[in-house]
Amino acid sequence: MKYHQKDIVEVNFLFPDGTFKPHPAIIVSNDQLQVDEDGMFYLVLITSNDWLNPQYSYPLSDEMVVGFSFSKPSLVKCQIITGNIERDVVRRLGTIKARYFNEIVDKIVDSIF
């Protein structure tokens, strides 16, 4: 398995207008899911767009991440989750620290359920 939970990866996200745009994302599903589901994992979108549905956003800063720095202020959009497989990943960017990852998961649960 090449990618793991907490990894920040770049993928092409499909938007409602049918276009694709590369974005960083955090792998939120556990590694066992990839094994059980033939390599599938779930990602949550990272963006610098802070105007759309801010109530579902979790702000990120460089100190929350290992191995990567954001070029702009960035947020996790906790309501935007996709299922992907390894071939969808353009590249691995870094890893989110465990403490912040757990806060993001809590925000996802609050945002969706």
Give the location of each predicted region.
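Compact nucleic-acid interaction/catalytic patches
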Residues: 19-22, 27-61
